[in-house]
Amino acid sequence: MKYNNEKKKGGSFKRGGKKGSNERDPFFEEEPKKRRKVSYDDDDIESVDSDAEENGFTGGDEDGRRVDGEVEDEDEFADETAGEKRKRLAEEMLNRRREAMRREREEADNDDDDDEDDDETIKKSLMQKQQEDSGRIRRLIASRVQEPLSTDGFSVIVKHRRSVVSVALSDDDSRGFSASKDGTIMHWDVSSGKTDKYIWPSDEILKSHGMKLREPRNKNHSRESLALAVSSDGRYLATGGVDRHVHIWDVRTREHVQAFPGHRNTVSCLCFRYGTSELYSGSFDRTVKVWNVEDKAFITENHGHQGEILAIDALRKERALTVGRDRTMLYHKVPESTRMIYRAPASSLESCCFISDNEYLSGSDNGTVALWGMLKKKPVFVFKNAHQDIPDGITTNGILENGDHEPVNNNCSANSWVNAVATSRGSDLAASGAGNGFVRLWAVETNAIRPLYELPLTGFVNSLAFAKSGKFLIAGVGQETRFGRWGCLKSAQNGVAIHPLRLA
């Protein structure tokens, strides 16, 4: 017979069909277990009674069985789709906000119980937050910054043995990260200053993670870190330096997880695209590489610079901003592998950052801070001598901060190099730092930047990071510049300094 050699699965079904038939009648198939549906009404949402029920524990013995012997039901939301989960979480968030507003009214003894007004208020606040996060509207923080008191100032919260070259903050402003020239990578708490050190794994582990070791190899030199970036979700930390690799670390465990090879020279700058796991890396080999940290994969490569790339920045869009020693700023359209070129009058652009998708800020090696717009290939506004280094015994008479004065010595010292510029994301508040003894705050206006205050800080300011709230500023400072030893300030302290900002 045709089916004699086939293995029978389960018993045969004899109800209503032919006796001994192996084919199952769909009518008698076991009905699949249906997922419990959650009702989403405008006003009422079914919620669990306790934390235990919410986590799926409703009583039973230690083996997970119910006391009455019944099998525990599956999690209520185990089979929900991604869309259903987003809807459920959104409804829960709205309910929490409505409840918070009701409590505020009760505390204020307000008898008005209009839920429609609450919903309208919540709608406006959520819309404004979304527009601020996406960069469509600008938060006006600069006008709220008050003049620092005499007691205010930078205080060192994390110490390093050598110059700090890069700092970064987590998206919630609670944790900070710093890297120095001696290869030390630190993870620290902003409020308490408690530090944790990232430990470099052995060569065998690095090799298994994708690193290509070169011989002979000086460990102290090869681990010199020059760049650092943290993902917006706080999961990954990326570092790079003279070993030509991009190293990925797990922030939760502080363990090394991946080493990306590919650059042919020192990795000089790193940044994550906000809200994603895409990482952009710039190098002295004049290329920008794009990586997917989650998938541990290389995506693409962008060219355009004719000199070493010194700084990079990115926002939400697939766009990258880079500057280099070829006196150009490049706006990379990553998916298309195209670029827009902006030329600067300075001999070298040292730093850059996005203000918005259409505006950028740059710092150069002659103490100039410039504002750029997407539609003009030259700076929209140039503030000269923003960090001019004035030698001892020389007065400032005749030196115009934003004038046409040219210093007697055209070869500006390393103290005036604007090594760092930063903005409070989505706002009109910016800062710049050099080695001339202070960090400068700026207000970004329409086609102009206006100086606010000078915050004294001794040393080369190699990196800056604003808190998202705008309530404090972090600076990576050291006795030497970011790249090389073009200057030395023995009175400076190597470390991370924090300065509180008082907002009106």
Swiss-Prot record:
Gene: YAO
Name the UniProt record assigns to this protein: U3 snoRNP-associated protein-like YAO
Pfam family, one: WD40
Disruption phenotype: Embryonic lethality when homozygous.
Ribonucleoprotein is among the record's keywords: yes
Function: Component of a nucleolar small nuclear ribonucleoprotein particle (snoRNP) thought to participate in the processing and modification of pre-ribosomal RNA. Essential for embryogenesis. Plays a critical role in embryo sac development and gametic cell fate. Required for the correct positioning of the first division plane of zygote. May function during early embryogenesis.
UniProt GO BP: acceptance of pollen; embryo development ending in seed dormancy; embryo sac development; rRNA processing
Organism: Arabidopsis thaliana (Mouse-ear cress)
Tissue: Expressed in tissues with active in cell division such as shoot apexes, root tips, lateral root primordia, embryos, endosperm, pollen grains and embryo sacs.
Region named Disordered: 1-120
